Amino acid sequence: MRVTKGAKFIAGSALLMLAVAACGGGESPSTPGGGGTTTAQPVRVEIAEPQHELVPGNTAETSGAEVLNALFIGLVNYDADKKPVNQIAETITSDDQVNWTIKLKDGYKFHDGTPVDAQSFVDSWNYTANGANAYEGNYFMGSIVGYDEMNPVDPDGEGPQEAPAATATSLSGLKVVDNLTFTVALKNPFSGFPTMLGYTAFYPMPKAAFGPDGKVTEAYGKSPVGNGPFKMAKPWERGKDQSISVVRYDEFKEGQAKLDAVDFMIYTDLATAYRDLQAGNLDIMDQLPAEAIGSAKAEFGDRYIEQPSSGVGYIGFPIKTGADYAKSADIRKAISMAIDRKTITETVFSGTRVPADDFISPVVSGYRQGACGEACTYDPVKAKELFDSAGGAKMGAIELGYNADGGHKEWIEAVANNLRTNLGAEVTPKPVEKFATILDDLGAKKWKGAFRMAWIMDYPSPENYLKPIFAAKASSNYSGFDDKAFEEHIKAGDSAKTLEEGIAAYQAADDILLKELPYIPVYFYQTNGAFSQNVKNVKIDPFERIELFNVERA
């Protein structure tokens, strides 16, 4: 997954001064190993602070992924129709959807000059799959033979018993055949396996990433050596530095990027970033604050971007460890029916969002218009009846948590007003400065109330809107949802001979979510971005990633 900050899962004058100081003036340093030397001011791109340091297997939110997309490329990329196309991979083949052979193109290099070879993929995947490393992308390795031995199950979940020790430190299903070939054995047939291989968790890492103890080094997390069109200009100190600086990697096999340097500017407030964009102190935003969308088209003209997005916005609940209202399926349904999605999308978002009626986005196969039915239909009377009959009035105030660095205040306040008016509930919006804090608290089972969440596809498949978020062992399962029938439907979809043949099974899993509502689908995203007069040829892909390789100075 890709959980989002704004459409990306993202304060005062002092912060503004820091942001402007970080992006204004100064020269990008010369860098060894094929990096460009520039005295021009870098192009400045808005992001939120990444949740973790910059390691592919531990990056599961879009701000970190935005940076990694500049630094790395994967086995596959995706065309305009969201179909996988080979990038580093020469071929990805299987006779049975279980045993896969991946052959690589020759000539790709890491930024330190070492070759991108089969071992670099196997080493990276093994490290991400090792449960001891607690990487966010661990779950995506779960279909490979040997994963279970590296990730033994805790017998009592959150109880006092501990999981047994792992019996392996590498995936037995990965085998290096030669420098440019490796094989992958899956536990079960999965026709969608090639489609997922463009996700960040599957990027390769060089030998330089690992220290003598076999661990990814702290230095690598601050200054990752990638294989993409840009390379790090200097190390990034998370929690300290207000920007992440990259420069062009001149020896990139696919040619040179048009830009010589990019600074990813870290903001804790979209409104501040937007003011910087208006003032010319920022060059690209891939998502604008809600309050700016209505006027941005007129202000920026052909420098305004509006297009369909793969994102879905939700209200989520920790259904096992949260407050009483979070644990009640009837209360969750009542809350959903009390939300006036149409008015929120038309008014708060100036018509640039669409009311959500499914967990699966309309941009991928498997979406069904109206699938959510009554639960996503605005009906204040029925919502109030259900809320009262389920004892909602006795369950205390409903907290609505959201990240203040993502431009969510307006729509969360609108939802809160819906619930106060239609349910008679006491509702407390709970802004948190950084989205990473919410994710960390959810992961630690500390968050008790409802929370704002969003998802942008990692790869174009209906499965990606279901399994990575709601499967019991998924690293992005912040709700705690656990349903055996759901898992069986997912398994059936994965095992189908083709993605198309698996859609019905994925939809059956979707139906279970629509009944239980661990999350409430609220709206489907559109991309609403803009860029300054300093740049041109700015495009944003369906994954909410800026296509930096082709951006040019104006």
Predicted regions and their residues:
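Long beta-strand-rich cores associated with HINT superfamily self-processing modules
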Residues: 529-554
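Gly/Pro-rich hinge or "lid" segments in bacterial periplasmic/extracellular proteins
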Residues: 186-256, 261
